[in-house]
Amino acid sequence: MKRKDIAKEFLRLAAGGKVREAYEKYVHTDFRHHNPYFRGDRESLLLGMEESAVMFPDKIFEAVRALEDGDLVAVHGRVRLKPDSPWIALFHIFRFEGNHIIEEWEAAQEVPPESPNKNGMF
């Protein structure tokens, strides 16, 4: 399995509420992240993702594209927390050690209902 496929599968499982399974399969024990809302360790983000899965059980995640360059993978995607909520555009950058995610960065932006840009965000 290519690293970009691992990254997409990790996000799919986590967004679908299978956070522990995603972590057990794909996240290195020495994982660290750069999400400003949680401590930078593995366990704090895992717990935050589990809490999100409980709060938003109908969450929809779609990976739009993924790029792989050496030990780095970038996934451009979108998530909808509830069926009637707006889409949120996401970028995740993962650094791998072997076939496990060891570091992660992310950025998110709500998709505006109207935009002068005819190309859209995706």
Enumerate the language-model features and the residues they cover.
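C-terminal and inter-domain tail/linker signature
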Residues: 1-122
